[in-house]
Amino acid sequence: MEIGQYQPNLDGDGLRIGIVQARFNEPVCNGLADSCIEELERLGVTGEDVLLVTVPGALEIPLALQKLAESAQFDALIALGAVIRGETYHFELVSNESGAGITRIGLDFGIPVANAVLTTENDEQAVARMTEKGRDAARVAVEMANLAVALEQLGGDDDEEEDEEEEA
């Protein structure tokens, strides 16, 4: 049996990408942002189509993502941050709450959100992962933005027909 299959599309030409970067653990977050932006450019996203905003920490990322999503100006969003375990329960709280908030934005607004908020045991693990995870976030955002467009087109002209029926 033959089945239809969508091939991943990493062409970023014409896509608008919003990035929210936490400033807490700034060297790691800057490394994530640098590699992410470099990869977006490699994928064809132009600098004028990228908006980078910074927030104090990982818990503030979801609100900034929400505001970007509400603007309807972006094809995909990217969350960048680093939560590094300390000696208290705060690590679990920040990791869980920021992750849940980031996921909720994508689902509530129907916009792809690439989550590259690192959660590591120590600084060394964060530094070791920042370049690769920044690149991964760029690829995820571009691929999912293109997939979202392709899947929206599956509905065809149903929306127009519904609008015409409502007007009649």
Curated annotation (Swiss-Prot):
Entry keyword set: Riboflavin biosynthesis, Transferase
Binding locations of 5-amino-6-(D-ribitylamino)uracil: 24, 58-60, 82-84, 115
SUPFAM superfamilies: Lumazine synthase
EC number: 2.5.1.78
Gene Ontology MF terms: 6,7-dimethyl-8-ribityllumazine synthase activity
Membrane spanning residue stretches: none
Superkingdom classification of source: Bacteria
Family label: Belongs to the DMRL synthase family.
PANTHER family: 6,7-DIMETHYL-8-RIBITYLLUMAZINE SYNTHASE, 6,7-DIMETHYL-8-RIBITYLLUMAZINE SYNTHASE DMRL SYNTHASE LUMAZINE SYNTHASE
Record's protein name: 6,7-dimethyl-8-ribityllumazine synthase
Taxon lineage: Bacteria, Pseudomonadati, Pseudomonadota, Betaproteobacteria, Burkholderiales
Protein encoded by which gene: ribH
